[in-house]
């Protein structure tokens, strides 16, 4: 299944039918497709109008905003939803969504309004959250802590002897890419690494892409859409 086929599949499904675990891949896939169409307007014939894609991103942002405010959501999942909602704002500029995301972010990293930033987890999603906080507030400490997480990840890879799940590696790739784009550090071999991950994606998930597992479908959608945009 290529990007066009997968795009048709996910676009035919109402946003509310996707499980929370599928929203991040779905959002990033649509952001990449939006960027593709913005650069190449004639591809609206393939992917629909920029407005249509924009509306899907808005709907995903609405789901994320609800999840962020749901007390039953675990802390690590909430961190991921906050990071995604702030990234959605970069395409769909709704200040209400940004306010929800920033309030929730600082409620986690600066509880009770403390001056010191604390990190309850050091996940790729936390790295993206910190990058967005730096982008929107200019708080240097957020950039420093995001950099520390990226460096720790490099050390962890060097010392790791056990293979980690592919989904986790993709989440780290996304975090590293976002860090490089926002903080502006030296770029790594991003396209090469992405293509290597794409090959592994299809080895592991290719046989399940036509299944009803929407989390798998949106992961592959994210991967294919980013590849297509990176090769423009």
Regions found by a protein language model. Name each.
Residues 2-5, 52-59, 103:
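Helix-turn-helix repeat elements of alpha-solenoid scaffolds
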Residues 42-62:
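Aromatic-lined substrate-binding rim segments of carbohydrate-active enzymes
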Residues 1-16, 25, 29-44, 48, ...:
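Terminal, non-catalytic domain-edge segments
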Residues 58-76:
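Blade-loop segments of beta-propeller domains
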Residues 73-89, 114-136, 164-180:
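Aromatic-lined, polymer-binding surfaces characteristic
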Residues 104-115:
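Asp-box/WD-like beta-propeller blade repeats and closely related beta-sheet repeat scaffolds
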Residues 20-38, 43, 59, 77-90:
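Non-membrane alpha-helical segments in proteins
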Residues 16, 20-23, 54, 75-78, ...:
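Inter-repeat boundary and helix-capping residues of tandem alpha-helical solenoids
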